[in-house]
């Protein structure tokens, strides 16, 4: 395989999985990434041809996207890797029937409306019928969607912070989307702990990195202020992935808070792995995916209520010396990105 074209709806660098595919494939073959230009700060990765397609113009933008894909896939030996592109994935397949092509599914629908979830998951399953080769993030997701003959392409992680952590305080970090995640429950749980703790025990801090739908971040900031957490909870908004290291360096506990719902249950959370690879124990909600990786040696599993968040913080602070950054990193070595992309490269080379 000499050339792979990766197609995704996200602007380059803002979808973690495809970013690391590019990073670790570029030393083995030519890599082209095609995605929307969403007006975010550009992420630069040497050795990658990035084509950012303008989203202006309604139907015209779709034609621009199709034109970019057509131009980059003229060689029938170019492998096309599509991170599921809602409503268009099937058309990409029809455009280039002779090219080896993979449909990669990272998630089912996480819409709050059951009707919309059913609709979008049905569309996904119909589009998947056009593909011979399909990769999925987890076996649970493949089973949930009723997909057969899929190849597992699990979530990976890279060490963002190599520093060994000191656990004299609890400097918690949540990184991820705020959309549909009920982060207000996390804030209420922190407030409950703060209200119960003795004055001398209030060595807790929480940084929330990410954004959601319009007005959502401001709403969470207001909730934190109402709870008297102005000196404890900090909101940074969105931070590009390649600028996260200083934040990870200064925190020692990761928060993987995902509501306990059927549509999130089999969704492996990116940040759980990144916290662990950075030597941070994790307070994680008890999803099926988190239960596969979180143990008493690298974190604590909780429910998704404020009381459970409070309990998780208490548990984390009771015996902080039981955690070792090196042991925590060792617990998830199988999920390192280089290993995962090695397997992906072998898979892509054998496509027909």
Tell what function each PLM region has.
Residues 12, 181, 242-244, 254-274, ...:
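Nucleotide-sugar-dependent
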